[in-house]
Amino acid sequence: MKKKVLAVLLGGCMVVGMLAGCGSNGGDTKTTDGDTKTEGSGDSKGYHFEVVVKSFQSSYWQAAVQGINQACDELGVTANTTGPNAESDIADQVNMLNNAINKNPDGIALAACDQNSVLGPLKTALEKKIPVVCFDSGVPDAPEGSVYATVVTDNEQAGGIAAEHIYPAIKDKLGKGQVRVGEVNQDATSANISERGMGFINKFIELAKADGFTVAVVGNDFYVNQVKDNGDQASADVILEVAVPAQTTVELCATEASNIMNKDDTIAMFGSNQVSAEGVLTANQNLNKLGTDDDKIVAAGFDAGSVIKAAVKDGTLLGAVTQSPLMMGYYAIYALTAAANGQKLEDVPTEGYWYDATNM
């Protein structure tokens, strides 16, 4: 699907909102489903939007809803936000999306749990001429014209940032015998997680090869099958083991992380979102293996929930990559308003940034 172009998204009101939003502390926001009804500025004509998020199980999504609410306040629009209990509840989310379409709103913002499961509903939205803006996760194979814009972090770049910081921290341990690096991804179905996981894998392989080391990627078939010129497991300098739990919970991510961390050759771990990073930290509560000392497993996380930030601050994690769910939710409402006003849309990319104990 060729992506369309958003020529007019950033009006003066949005620039003000961006500056205000960047100063907000979205990580600890607590929200509930329901309408956000406000009176604000902007050529909104009283639009009503439906928003379907991945879940409300983490502070990440609570921050996204805070951004949605902020944009509604500024534009004078309303938004009803729903989402399943967990990001692995794909069928529940599809039902919520179908219900949203049946309400014939002025637009729908969607953060898809599974990029393939929403193709049918997106076709229906297209037929009903309901604009859809995807945020947090794109839907690359969406029916042509169904998705007006996508507001996402450059997830491949963001995953690569973690590799760029983990690799130099463990480089001196390479070439002295086979070692293992673990990656825990909460799923293999959503575009953002899969792109982020592959971003870490590809960047790590690139850095290792540049220094003359070989890498063999093992574990979850979805990720292994995307690796080009995968190394030989028997002879590789580094085994990069990728694990995906059966469901997207911290507890199951912790089980996967424990399995890798208990192996004697493991020297590094990466949890590619808040749930999986907290899973790595939960595993460490029993194992006490994470840290930056020579005898510890170096680990990095993703997102900026309070548990992850505390682990970065005390040195349990080397650092983490952060993004702004608040601003993605915020941009999504502005994009829907622009679409409802007949403006042309383009994708809105946002970047990931590294933080550690020195720059928190």
Task: Annotate each language-model stretch with its function.
Residues 3-5, 22-360:
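A residue-level marker of the well-folded mature domains of exported/periplasmic proteins
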Residues 17-21:
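C-terminal motif of bacterial Sec signal peptides marking the signal peptidase cleavage site
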Residues 3-13:
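Sec-dependent N-terminal signal peptides
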